[in-house]
Amino acid sequence: MIAATTGTSADTYAPDDIDGDIHTVLWPVHSGLLRYCGFDVIEPFIAHMPGRVGPEVRQRYLDDYRTRLFDIVHAPRLFFRPAQDYGRNERLRPGVIARSGVQRNV
């Protein structure tokens, strides 16, 4: 699981916003490093702009992170297509539909 902070609000990490979807931003690490090395990839924990929010929000981030760590075995896993869904060229086989905004059919 990636745990990260951002310098901007959660609103800027939507697919049509300036920073783009957070899953797109993290895709190279999730897919190219963690999944490739055999890890189950857990939904990331993101604390948005902790330096610009009040102490009560920062405390909530810490509490939420603590809860996530204590219950990590039940944390949602990200979906990745199995290897057999890819051809020799490492592209999705014809008829296999991409399931994420990062993994697109072209």
Where are the language model's segments positioned?
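Short glycine-rich His-centered loop
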Residues: 6-10
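Glycine-rich phosphate/pyrophosphate-binding loop and the adjoining helix
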Residues: 11-106
